[in-house]
Amino acid sequence: MDIGCKVLVFFTCFLTVTAEIYIVTMEGEPIISYKGGDNGFEATAVESDEKIDTTSELVTSYARHLERKHDMLLGMLFVEGSYKKLYSYKHLINGFAAHVSPDQAEMLRRAPGVKSVDRDWKVRKLTTHTPQFLGLPTDVWPTGGGYDRAGEDIVIGFIDSGIFPHHPSFASHHTTVPYGPHPSYKGKCEEDPHTKISFCNGKIIGAQHFAEAAKAAGAFNPDIDFASPMDGDGHGSHTAAIAAGNNGIPVRMHGYEFGKASGMAPRARIAVYKALYRLFGGFVADVVAAIDQAVHDGVDILSLSVGPNSPPATTKTTFLNPFDATLLGAVKAGVFVAQAAGNGGPFPKTLVSYSPWITTVAAAIDDRRYKNHLTLGNGKMLAGIGLSPSTRPHRSYKMVSANDVLLGSSGMKYNPSDCQKPEVLNKKLVEGNILLCGYSFNFVAGSASIKKVAETAKHLGAAGFVLVVENVSPGTKFDPVPSCIPGILITDVSKSMDLIDYYNVTTSRDWMGRVKDFKAEGSIGDGLEPILHKSAPEVALFSARGPNTKDFSFQDADLLKPDILAPGSLIWSAWSANGTDEANYIGEGFALISGTSMAAPHIAGIAALVKQKHPQWSPAAIKSALMTTSTVIDRAGRPLQAQQYSETETVTLVKATPFDYGSGHVNPSAALDPGLIFDAGYEDYIGFLCTTPGIDAHEIKNFTNTPCNFKMVHPSNFNTPSIAISHLVRTQTVTRRVTNVAEEEETYTITSRMEPAIAIEVSPPAMTVRAGASRTFSVTLTVRSVTGAYSFGQVTLKGSRGHKVTLPVVAMGQRR
């Protein structure tokens, strides 16, 4: 008996040490594509882009059948207690996630009925004024009955870090029309385990959390991660409010109002699927379970501000893995998917969103800039940033460096110039003066914050504070932070050195270097009001860039990514009271943050408006409408520009390309009436996969349950509103099919342009398309010279009734 217990304990410890999470895909169709024939179960599949009635007896009985098969396989192979099944995936893919040892994973790979076994991998988050910037209040919301009808009955699902349900952006009473029951959504609402109150209120229509993989990996901490849909990070609340937050919510911090916030579709319903957490991000097994559940519940739109930390270990292509295959199933079910492009810019091939069925969103800087200035006693004015009030007008204040006002007893266990600890600074010397602090790497790493600098300065009675940057690494992002007292961050190193030189020259010291008299003076300007720039939009420095890649050897794909550009820099939106994702906004109700995480929900919300107006449109049709009506011209009438590094590693502006912005910056009002669309369905996506060189047909069958019987000839013939040819030899012709979604017949003139290395020709030069009808046209590209670089161009279809449809063209000429 004693020996048996010891053996059991040893075996359990062995599993704990070596077990990992694996995602297993099985033979047999998931619910979305099952056509019947398995043990007498009737078909559950519907036509592409249609929704399944997940409550029907057909669906529920087949779902139970699949789960029993998963359990039977595990029970047949392994002793009970030696493994843990985390999820059964039944709706979009047929498989399960399990916590098993590597040896057990190998047994699963060899087991009959198993198609693939993938070790789980991590994902990460890709982290007001924009409705006006995009023209929603004047040009879009009125067409749907006003802001209190914009997005009516459209459900947006958020795969993110949860939601703070008590925020006014999500209040159900902030509307003139009460929310009633939704006609088709079937998701459930979890309760707060502490208050026993539901997370749902009519505006929030579904709320669930997924953490089985996180728990199995030992990453989940219930004290800070919350075993509920509660947002312990802030990121999820921020993204949900961007897409579907209530209209006209005052953004207040430190006694100041920074405008009024609104979601893109303020009447849309919010369905929360929490699968990301504050410290470790998330696991694909949890994210796949969340997506599977969201589509089962009946969401219309999925917003994904999430991407992989690294490529999956066992897949050969970027398009085929459990995550992308699940999203393909979602699109097949009629769900539009917006995913953040990633924050690896401005470097090429940094995208984390690859597949043609996903709408990949890059981040733009809009026309609002928060600038401030510091005026020195010698009259020199230094530019900086800071969302703060000014010091008293017509008055200068002495400036004191934190390093010069240290208390003698302070232990130097941290960098005192960071100004994070008021107790180590001499209040008598700081009081009434401007505190001069240093912006060290600790601010980049998150162990120091501007919020704490402001609190330190206020505690010491300072008139304000200045942060100087003495050195900076490429990629360092400086965002303005709201402050309760006057404050400014001097982001330019040369200007910071001007300030330091002025301070050192004017400060009187004894022979030991101790200050005898502080004589440097300065005053801080008013940084509360934004300045509007006509150069907007611009592609943000951090926004991931193309070209798209088809495998993890970084070979270029014949598919343009990103797809579209949307606001993603300095976005005001809701924040969780528990949020710790941004140190500067801990405990606040709103946050001003940047990332492609912020761009994706803009597109999700705008897609909801398009879906509201055109409820029968497929995800590809919605994507096409957004892309073909986007703009490549900024507010000043110039071609879009992108932030980029110069040779000296300073940030500069260069002419942007489709690898920066895709088709262009979103134009919501035009997207509601695009004239023509480039539609595509499930078979088109399979055709793209089957014609992409290097993708094995067996692998396609494993992940999609669909054989390669489609004749597309070349992946560039996939019917998307862009053309990309990574290996153009001599001449190649591609075709596109357009459908007239306007109410009347229209004649389109087709023109094209291309950079000199590639010749371009379109045929026919004009065509008439009846309402509801489809026509094809061809684009022929010919290599004129091999330059070793991509050439960029555009095809434009200009309609006789005012519609204008554009698609970008990218191609690289090769000798063979």
Swiss-Prot record:
One Pfam annotation reads Peptidase_S8
Question: What does the entry give for GO biological process?
Answer: proteolysis
EC class: hydrolase
Start and end residues of each PA domain: 418-492
InterPro entries documented for this protein: C5a/SBT2-like_Fn3, Peptidase_S8/S53_dom, Peptidase_S8/S53_dom_sf, Peptidase_S8_Asp-AS, Peptidase_S8_Ser-AS, Peptidase_S8_subtilisin-rel, Peptidases_S8_3, S8pro/Inhibitor_I9
Q: Where is the Inhibitor I9 domain?
A: 22-124
Propeptide positions, renumbered to this chain? 20-126
Domain Peptidase S8, chain residue ranges per copy = 120-672
Q: Does the keyword Manganese apply?
A: no
* Active site, per annotation: 160, 235, 597
> Which GO molecular function terms does the record list?
serine-type endopeptidase activity
Q: EC number(s) on record? A: 3.4.21.-
Q: Where in the cell is it found?
A: Secreted
Q: Keywords in alphabetical order, please.
A: Autocatalytic cleavage, Glycoprotein, Hydrolase, Protease, Secreted, Serine protease, Signal, Zymogen
Q: Which cysteines are joined by disulfide bonds?
A: none
Q: Which family does it belong to?
A: Belongs to the peptidase S8 family.
Protein's name according to its UniProt entry: Subtilisin-like protease SBT2.6
Q: Which organism is it from?
A: Arabidopsis thaliana
